[in-house]
Regions:
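Short, solvent-exposed, Trp/other aromatic-anchored flexible loops in extracytoplasmic proteins
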Residues: 97-150
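Short, surface-exposed linear segments at secondary-structure transitions and domain or protein termini
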Residues: 87-92, 102-110, 163-165
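Short, surface-exposed binding/anchoring microloops in extracellular/periplasmic proteins
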Residues: 37-97
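Short beta-strand elements
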Residues: 152-165
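A generic structural micro-feature
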Residues: 59, 134-136, 154
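A eukaryote-biased signal for short, well-structured alpha-helical docking elements
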Residues: 24-38
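Short, cysteine-centered beta-strand-loop-beta hairpins and adjacent loop/turn segments enriched
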Residues: 74, 148-154
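Sec-dependent N-terminal signal peptides of Gram-positive bacterial secreted proteins and lipoproteins
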Residues: 1-27
């Protein structure tokens, strides 16, 4: 009888310690806009643009947001912006968008990177006005890969991670 009581108490104790750590939180931005910056980049997540033809949030499935990336540092020769979300219980990150027009990702890749860099250097931000983020995601990652003018052969990368609090 004493062994059963001790076992029951130990089990309850362990459940109180382990159960809260298994709780997952969905990534929601309580306060928008939210911004992260570095010496080179400013990354801001805000409310999604609304309008005809734009996707709307769907309760229980996904939220919608907008993203704005500004070059606040030195001029760049080429730039790429990638967005990822996580999947609970997985180390794999999932891209939030595919290649333009379902084309091969590497085709015209360099030309797009140079075109984006030119716009960023001219003070125009990269703006993604309406993107989906699954409710089950607990992490949103923006990865920027660029080459600096004068250092063309060496790509640089920064990652901005927004997590559930």
């Amino acid at each position: 009888m004493v062994k059963k009581t001790i076992f029951a108490i130990c089990t309850l104790f362990l459940l109180n310690i382990v159960a809260p750590t298994l709780e997952t939180k969905a990534l929601t931005f309580d306060k928008l806009p939210t911004k992260q910056t570095s010496k080179q980049w400013s990354v801001q997540v805000d409310k999604a643009d609304q309008g005809k033809g734009l996707v709307k949030p769907e309760k229980g499935k996904f939220h919608t947001y907008s993203l704005e990336v500004d070059n606040i540092g030195k001029d760049v020769l080429s730039a790429e912006v990638h967005m990822f979300r996580n999947e609970p219980n997985s180390t794999t990150k999932f891209s939030l968008f595919s290649c333009p027009d379902e084309k091969e990702c590497n085709k015209e890749h360099f030309e797009r990177a140079i075109s984006l860099a030119d716009k960023l250097n001219d003070g125009y931000p990269y703006r993604f006005s309406n993107f989906l983020l699954a409710e089950k995601a607990t992490e949103f990652e923006v990865e920027i890969i660029w080459t600096q003018k004068g250092m063309e052969g060496r790509p640089l990368k920064e990652t901005f991670t927004f997590t559930a609090e």
